[in-house]
Amino acid sequence: MIIKRREYMRIADYSVTKAVLDRHGFTFKKSFGQNFLTDTNILQKIVDTAEIDQNVNVIEIGPGIGALTEFLAENAAEVMAFEIDDRLVPILADTLRDFDNVQVVNQDILKADLQTQIKQFKNPDLPIKVVANLPYYITTPILMHLIESKIPFQEFVVMMQREVADRISAEPNTKAYGSLSIAVQYYMTAKVAFIVPRTVFVPAPNVDSAILKMVRRDQPLIEVKDEDFFFRVSRLSFVHRRKTLWNNLTSHFGKSEDIKTKLEKGLALADIKPSIRGEALSIQDFGKLADALKEVGL
């Protein structure tokens, strides 16, 4: 396996990126949300943040022309890169020809049989980290698909729209806090590592990006009686952010006297005021609320 760092120009150097795209006659597709990073310092920082070494396998999503893949391959045991755009497969074969520890899988990550795919690693027992520059338009579905999968991904270091990274890592009583924060933080710790300006991409997106580091918890943050119901309660509590918890709950469950009586009992059991807003409740509070509402028959 070749792990020596390249001494010549990087794929991410702007002149190299442009030459590769021109040589292959590549044009960007908006439908794939393609923005290629052209800053080698940021790429190195991503690898450092992910703490990639020879004892780690990496799954990359959306390798593009291989700018990040190059850095990952120099450090990881193996890299499995999922690329949905079949036009990029021959380009990746060209740009990554010096590496024998990279597998390019021409498939949508949401449709891939990951349990089968990870067995293709030479050493599938090594910890697996996900490192990716995620397309803005499908960031959340990809993340939740991977987080909720049965595969014990140890860590995620992913680039995404800054606003989404802020929402995922947000704490209660902040504007960004919501059901997405809860859905991710139930399983993972989440912290914004650093900001990536829009100016370092080709083509430049309309907003800045952020690198979000997420580490899987040994166990979910809290224990709840019914996970699906817990996530349902957290989601419906933010449907109308400026409305009280009571208004959101009655909008969802109904306003009959029987329902309102059960809601009152559940809120009292969880020791939560009906007049509070969802953004003021911690994940632990939502766990207590969901369990209490379940207990009273909702």
UniProtKB/Swiss-Prot annotation:
CDD domains: AdoMet_MTases. It catalyses: adenosine(1518)/adenosine(1519) in 16S rRNA + 4 S-adenosyl-L-methionine = N(6)-dimethyladenosine(1518)/N(6)-dimethyladenosine(1519) in 16S rRNA + 4 S-adenosyl-L-homocysteine + 4 H(+). SUPFAM superfamilies: S-adenosyl-L-methionine-dependent methyltransferases. Keywords: Cytoplasm, Methyltransferase, RNA-binding, rRNA processing, S-adenosyl-L-methionine, Transferase. The keyword Transferase applies. Pfam families: RrnaAD. It comes from the Bacteria. InterPro entries: KsgA/Erm (IPR001737), rRNA_Ade_diMease-like_C (IPR023165), rRNA_Ade_Mease_Trfase_CS (IPR020596), rRNA_Ade_methylase_Trfase_N (IPR020598), rRNA_adenine_dimethylase (IPR011530), SAM-dependent_MTases_sf (IPR029063). Specifically dimethylates two adjacent adenosines (A1518 and A1519) in the loop of a conserved hairpin near the 3'-end of 16S rRNA in the 30S particle. May play a critical role in biogenesis of 30S subunits. Belongs to the class I-like SAM-binding methyltransferase superfamily. rRNA adenine N(6)-methyltransferase family. RsmA subfamily. This is Ribosomal RNA small subunit methyltransferase A. It comes from Streptococcus pyogenes serotype M2 (strain MGAS10270).
